[in-house]
UniProtKB/Swiss-Prot annotation:
The keyword Nuclease does not apply. GO terms for cellular component: cytosolic large ribosomal subunit. Belongs to the bacterial ribosomal protein bL35 family. Coiled coil: none annotated. It comes from the Bacteria. This is Large ribosomal subunit protein bL35. Keywords: Ribonucleoprotein, Ribosomal protein. GO terms for molecular function: structural constituent of ribosome. The keyword Cytoplasm does not apply. It comes from Thermotoga neapolitana (strain ATCC 49049 / DSM 4359 / NBRC 107923 / NS-E). One of its GO terms (biological process) is translation. The gene is rpmI.
Length: 65
């Protein structure tokens, strides 16, 4: 059976930590930022963890499962 290909768009968006959590960037921070408050933009710069409902789907795209 051939190896499973990694989805390249998912590989650029997600990263798996050593403990198995999946890290992602926030959306809504590159366009129409003039309307948004400073503290909102600062919060959007931080990384976020993928929810447990989406974890298996992302792992499959990354070829880890």
């Amino acid at each position: 059976m051939p190896k499973m290909k990694t989805n390249r768009s998912a590989a650029k968006r997600f990263r798996v930590t050593r403990k198995g959590k999946i890290i992602r960037n926030h959306a809504y921070k590159s366009h129409k930022t003039r309307k948004k408050r400073r503290n909102v933009l600062r919060a959007l710069r931080k990384k976020d963890v993928v929810s447990s409902a989406d974890k298996n789907r992302v792992l499959r795209l990354l070829g880890k499962k």
